[in-house]
């Protein structure tokens, strides 16, 4: 199968997802260094989630019989002066990803590619939750008297965790991808809310 504009955009999005994963690791490490373990854990988990979004896309491209070249990524931001800065960056990143997923969905529809359209529809729904969760976290941080209030909020509300899987709301996906792609690729159990199998977790 020859690459189409949709497939070329999707291949580029693989790089964007890996870049988002790396940025979340950098944010998590910064919070870790500030002795804010729940914020750190939240973003380590977000990093894993973005990585596995990328792997889902890689698996999809390969399953469609298309060769893929994994793109490189730009350096990420590691230094922040306030705790609000990484949260603002994270929200902006999720909004940018949402815009790119919308572009992918539109490209699949333009090409009359129902498989691509269905695949991207899952990511669109995911991004609604991701943007909402990150917006909530940023708003809580801005209203909190101190960062330990944010830590307690994360412990109480499990923002971005959602019970550890997409079967309930939205959590992390793990590295394996089976189920929807026939026969399975990697290990794990199938979460009812995802088009893929979830392979490892934190």
Regions found by a protein language model. Give the residues of each.
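Iron-associated oxidoreductase/ferritin-like identity signal
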Residues: 1-202
């Amino acid at each position: 199968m020859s690459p189409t504009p949709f497939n070329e955009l999707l291949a580029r999005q693989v790089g964007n997802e890996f870049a988002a994963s790396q940025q979340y690791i950098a944010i998590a490490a910064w919070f870790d260094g500030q002795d804010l373990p729940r914020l750190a854990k939240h973003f380590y988990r977000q990093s894993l989630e973005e990585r596995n979004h990328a792997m889902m896309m890689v698996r999809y491209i390969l399953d469609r019989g298309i060769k893929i070249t994994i793109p490189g990524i730009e350096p990420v931001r590691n230094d922040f002066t306030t705790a609000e800065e990484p949260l603002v960056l994270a929200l902006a990143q999720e909004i940018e990803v949402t815009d790119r997923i919308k572009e992918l969905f539109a490209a699949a529809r333009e090409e009359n590619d129902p498989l691509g359209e269905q695949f991207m529809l899952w990511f669109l729904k995911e991004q609604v939750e991701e943007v909402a969760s990150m917006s909530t976290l940023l708003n809580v941080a801005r209203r909190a008297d101190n960062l330990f209030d944010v830590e307690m909020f994360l412990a109480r509300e499990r923002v971005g965790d959602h019970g550890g899987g997409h079967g309930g709301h939205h959590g992390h996906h793990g590295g394996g991808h089976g189920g929807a792609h026939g026969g399975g690729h990697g290990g794990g159990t199938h979460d009812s809310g995802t088009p893929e199998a979830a392979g490892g977790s934190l």
